[in-house]
């Protein structure tokens, strides 16, 4: 998705309690400043706090998202799972799909594709994560890996206007290796090229 706004996404992971919700007040005040008029903030707390954050952020420039969803949109026997419709129903506007930690815990390109389809059907905006490992980077497979993840993740998806492409260099997470700005710029350009090639016949949203 492209527009003239800058998005900052705060993934809370498995952190936070009811007492944490009030911490957003300072961010709300900051977001009202004129210099941040083109900035949107997305908070992605645990499921247990989504509703509370939704209530706190009404009539602000802060949106609330979930950190994952099940690929099945109907109710069913999926213990411990939450689907996209349930997330949407409590006020969430975004959902993170394909995060490296979830990939490491069993998410596949196939399940990610099904989750994205499910989220789009529920009218959620998708933060689609992808990225290469340190081994893949060292073997100079970055572009190949990313192209494959994007291709499989967006299989048979024609409308990408509500998909945010989130490059997540797995090799920099917890390793102390910080990617250089020019390195990230180069990779973002490559990702745009990949997405344009993949979606050219379906959409003109990628710029």
Predicted regions and their residues:
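Active-site loop-to-helix "anion-binding N-cap" substructures in soluble metabolic enzymes
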Residues: 1-207
């Amino acid at each position: 998705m492209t527009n003239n706004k800058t998005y900052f996404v705060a993934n809370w992971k498995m952190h936070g309690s009811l007492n944490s919700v009030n911490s957003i007040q300072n961010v709300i005040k900051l977001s009202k400043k004129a210099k941040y008029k083109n900035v949107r903030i997305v908070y992605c707390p645990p499921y247990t706090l989504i509703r509370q954050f939704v209530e706190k952020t009404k009539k602000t420039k802060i949106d609330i998202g979930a950190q994952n969803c099940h690929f099945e949109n109907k109710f069913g026997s999926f213990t411990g799972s939450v689907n996209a419709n349930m997330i949407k129903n409590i006020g969430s506007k975004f959902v993170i799909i394909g995060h490296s930690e979830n990939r490491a815990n069993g998410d596949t390109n196939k399940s990610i594709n099904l989750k994205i389809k499910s989220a789009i059907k529920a009218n959620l905006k998708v933060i689609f994560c992808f990225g290469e490992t340190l081994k893949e980077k060292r073997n100079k497979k970055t572009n190949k890996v990313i192209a494959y993840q994007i291709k499989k993740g967006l299989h048979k998806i024609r409308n990408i206007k509500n998909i945010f492409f989130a490059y997540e260099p797995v090799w920099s997470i917890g390793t102390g290796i910080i990617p250089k700005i020019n390195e990230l710029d180069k990779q973002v350009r490559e990702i745009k090229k990949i997405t344009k090639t993949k979606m050219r016949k379906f959409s003109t949203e990628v710029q």
